[in-house]
Curated annotation (Swiss-Prot):
Residues reported to bind Zn(2+) 2: D82, H83, E119, D165, H200
Cofactor binding note of this UniProt entry: Binds 2 Zn(2+) ions per subunit.
Gene: lactb2
EC number: 3.1.27.-
Compartment(s): Mitochondrion matrix
Nuclease keyword on record: yes
GO cellular component: mitochondrial matrix
Functional note: Endoribonuclease; cleaves preferentially 3' to purine-pyrimidine dinucleotide motifs in single-stranded RNA. The cleavage product contains a free 3' -OH group. Has no activity with double-stranded RNA or DNA. Required for normal mitochondrial function and cell viability.
Family named by the database record: Belongs to the metallo-beta-lactamase superfamily. Glyoxalase II family.
Name used for this protein in its record: Endoribonuclease LACTB2
One Pfam family linked to the record: BLACT_WH
Residue sites binding Zn(2+) 1 per the record: H78, H80, E119, H146, D165
Cofactor requirements of the protein: Zn(2+)
GO molecular function: RNA endonuclease activity; single-stranded RNA binding; zinc ion binding
């Protein structure tokens, strides 16, 4: 499926400007979405793209000039390099040093994190914290699953959610922990948001339908895995064997990413006692049903 074409710089609403990270790829889609949020002379920047992408720094400078604003603070949705990687370059090339707050949720279990070469410490937030700037109020939503430190942000003025990588504008997300991820999707569904500003891909206008689609998709994948194992109950399968059955319509270059997700489904099903794992000598899986 061809991806939507996104401009590098676009005003999405009265208080949200998207600056594309200029880092397209199989996992980043059109690139990381970074967002300037607010209406005043100082605004919040959500996410920062990857390190050493001068095109992004140029686009961000253009946005700051065009909207006659500067960066009040930075909030990053999670620790992945395509979201935190640009912080040091922004500090060096735009802000003349990190004399402002860079905030995120702590890793779980906690580990000390330093921001690139600038050795700036993060300001750690918690679920429910409120961050304000002129024209915008953001509420922190702890949404682990994609990563252990993942946050979404509710934009109160628009009944919208900045979803980070919990929900994408196109395709589906990868995750570290499926159990946590499903809980986070349910949490976002309960928000009854109208709109999603995702970490990658275009804006989602039917927020609740998209979140429900993600939940249904994961449940359907789980059923496909169980069906493949039950139809061959005398056999055991490697995770890649199952990818080739369950993700048969997915391009082969995405099979490794698909295997990552499928393995988490297998771990969840094992916890529930529905399947078992054996070593022979590689890890193989069989149905218990």
């Amino acid at each position: 499926m061809a991806l939507s074409v996104l401009p590098r710089l676009e005003q999405l609403s009265a208080r949200v400007v998207r600056v594309l990270g200029c880092n397209p790829g199989p996992m980043t889609l059109q690139g990381t979405n970074t967002y300037l949020v607010g209406t005043g002379p100082r605004r919040i920047l959500i996410d920062t793209g990857e390190p050493a992408v001068p095109e992004y720094i140029s686009c961000l400078k253009q946005a700051l000039t065009e909207f006659n604003t500067s960066i009040q603070e930075i909030i990053v949705t999670h620790w992945h390099v395509d979201h935190v990687g640009g912080i040091a370059d922004i500090c060096t090339d735009i802000m003349n040093g990190c004399n402002f707050s860079v905030s995120k949720l702590p890793r779980n279990p906690h580990q000390e994190e330093v921001i690139g070469a600038v050795e700036h410490k993060y300001n750690y937030l918690k679920d429910g914290d409120i961050i304000t700037t002129e024209g915008a109020t953001l509420r922190v939503l702890y949404t682990p699953g994609h990563t252990d430190d993942h946050m979404a942000l509710e934009l109160l003025e628009e009944n919208a959610i900045f979803s980070g990588d919990c929900i994408l504008g196109e395709g589906t997300a990868v995750f570290e922990d499926l159990y946590d991820y499903m809980k986070s999707l349910e949490k976002l569904l309960e928000m009854k948001a109208d709109k999603i500003y995702p970490g990658h891909g275009p804006v989602v206008l039917g927020a609740r339908a998209k979140i429900q689609e993600y939940i249904s998709h994961r449940h359907a994948r789980e059923q496909q895995i169980l069906q493949a194992l039950q139809e061959n109950s005398g056999r055991s399968f490697t995770s890649m064997d199952l990818v080739k059955i369950v993700y048969k319509d997915t391009p082969e270059y995405l099979h490794k990413a698909a295997e990552f997700n499928l393995t988490h489904h297998l771990q969840k099903l094992k916890k529930e006692g529905k399947i078992s794992e054996e070593q022979s000598p590689t890890v193989r899986w069989r149905s218990n049903l």
